[in-house]
Amino acid sequence: MQTVRADLFRLLGDEDRLRLLALCAEEELTVGELAQLLDESQPQITKKTQPLREVGLLAARRDGTRTLLKSDLRADVVIAAAVTEGRRLCSKDGSLAKVARVVAQREELSKKLFDAPAKTEPVPALGEGLAAWLPIFAPLLPGRALAIDAGTGEGALLPLLSPLYERVIAVDRSAARLARCAARLDAWGLANVRLREGSIEDSASLAEDVMPRGGADLVVISRVLHHLGRPQDAISSATRLLRAGGHLAIVDYMPHDDEALREHGHVWLGFEPTKLEHWIVDAGLAPVVVQPLPTPHHPPLQLAIGRKPARATA
């Protein structure tokens, strides 16, 4: 929608709209998150953002029943000045400083669920249910020194990774899930797997272990990204752990509308393949493949693989 200059000046003459524009330039945020940051009701936020959406200054994206808003920062001195002023206002009222905390709250439910005691269940047979995963690893095997399973959970992929790689590091932020994973490793007899408690987004300590040896040949992030407030941060962190020529393999859901999964800690209801590819490229990887996985899983899964170039700086 074309906006004449006078209309744009009038639109940006409202301090509340300047705040909204600045906050959505900082992070893609839901209406509910904006309401929390500005201490207003969601209907008020919806009313105030609507004019910005109508002229294209805010881009809206659906995720199930939620709407996320992001500022469309075109090369325009007036809009740039508006965002700068909005940031000043948000810094003054404290809302800008709260953005990181609000985004982190997206993951609170999944953290509570994963740390909860699990029902006692028998350890599955070694290799049970892994046949469908075998095609994923075929193009990734030239380098077989080290694989990292980021967000290993209870170790579902470890019986496949352990025989293929000399060393495997399995990382998870849930101590409870790692304890259950350790019991499974003992039962399976997988001696070359080492468990580490931590988050892939904060990979500094892991890098100290991995990078002196040249980096990992493979980092797997399987059904993890939909639990994270900022999935792109995990992809960037994983990329930094790869050796030149190493691969990042992501398995996650295609877009779906099963809102009930939010009760199980799902922050996002799947991802568009183009979104995964965009994040892979932004992290400094060359896309190898982004495609649906031929499994009966519901919601349907997809695979995205990126390769770290030989002279990558990421």
Question: Where on the chain are the PLM-derived regions?
Answer:
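Conserved alpha-helix/loop element of class I SAM-dependent methyltransferases that forms part
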Residues: 126-145
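C-terminal alpha-helical "lid/dimerization" subdomain adjacent to the S-adenosyl-L-methionine
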Residues: 247-305
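A short glycine-rich, Lys/Arg-flanked "PGG" loop and its adjoining helix->strand segment in the class I
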Residues: 232-247
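Beta-hairpin "wing" of winged helix-turn-helix
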Residues: 54-63, 70
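Class I SAM-dependent methyltransferase SAM/SAH-binding core
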Residues: 148, 154-207
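A conserved beta-strand element that flanks and buttresses the S-adenosyl-L-methionine
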Residues: 220
